[in-house]
From Swiss-Prot:
SUPFAM superfamilies: PurM C-terminal domain-like (SSF56042), PurM N-terminal domain-like (SSF55326). Its EC number is 6.3.3.1. This is Phosphoribosylformylglycinamidine cyclo-ligase. It is an enzyme of class 6 (ligase). The gene is purM. It is found in: Cytoplasm. It comes from Moorella thermoacetica (strain ATCC 39073 / JCM 9320). Belongs to the AIR synthase family. NCBIfam families: purM (TIGR00878).
Amino acid sequence: MVAGEGFTYAAAGVDIAAGNRAVELMKEHVRRTFRPGVLGDLGGFGGLFALEAGRYRQPVLVAGTDGVGTKLKIAFSLDRHDTIGIDAVAMCVNDILVQGAEPLFFLDYLAVGKMVPERVARIVAGVAEGCRRAGCALIGGETAEMPGFYREDEYDLAGFAVGVVEREELLDGSRIRPGQVVLGLASSGLHSNGFSLARRVLLVEAGYTLERKLPELGRTLGEELLEPTRIYVASILPLLKEGLIKGLAHITGGGLIENPPRILPPGCSLRLDRRSWPVPPAFRLIQATGRVPEEEMYRTFNMGLGMLVVVEESDAGRVKSRLEAAGEKVFVVGEVIPGRREVEFVPGLQ
């Protein structure tokens, strides 16, 4: 569209008015996440958060960033956008939690092919819900309209979380030693990893539709795949503050093979008993349908465990009970053994 003799930004595909409308629609969702420390309101060039210095002796800020990956393709196909923001928050806050940090605030980055205010508001409402579950404030973000870069019905979503921990309470692997017990917290499904493989196997090779109800899942494939990533902050944080947790591993890309070694000190390995927790049907479906090797499954997916928790043997019972009381499904899945920073599975992977 031409205004007078020149082109407008709207003619190039960027609708500033629609962007402003999206901001108005999301404001109340965002404000409901505010916690003590938040300064100002929406609309500033930067989000503001005041750290209460008197509460800490040597505070360390812990930052994490992540995206949702190709799980977004499922949201596009189903035109369901209200929970994908929870995934963006979960991937970030669970990561900083494993360092011992309490999440303080979050920022999101949303890039869209076409600014549809109602859709953007639904996405951000999901981000706000994730922040509420994690106890952190959504203090800012960016929504960029990028015509010609993304299709009109597509977008990308990423986030950035910042938390705080006392320097002496940082979880850096130094508290882990042989003889400690490993607890596994159940995942809610695939979380936000392995979707390129899952989509290839289930949607392309098997030809399933997202609307198809599969008996082994007890719901539609789309509902299973869109299940939000579980956020573990509320259940784990009190135990961290009491010093009962010696190590945490967020099971994301790399699965149970590559993530646990990231937290292990030299001289330690994990032995995990694969018979000690139930593998959800979705993973068995992917493995059987795609003839995916067992080792590939354990390197790609969480296989039913979203977080590993390392505790002293003497504390294992009460930590398990506390986590269960907080709503987690908890399994005693293994132990720390002498080794070379790797995971040993019993029985071994085929």
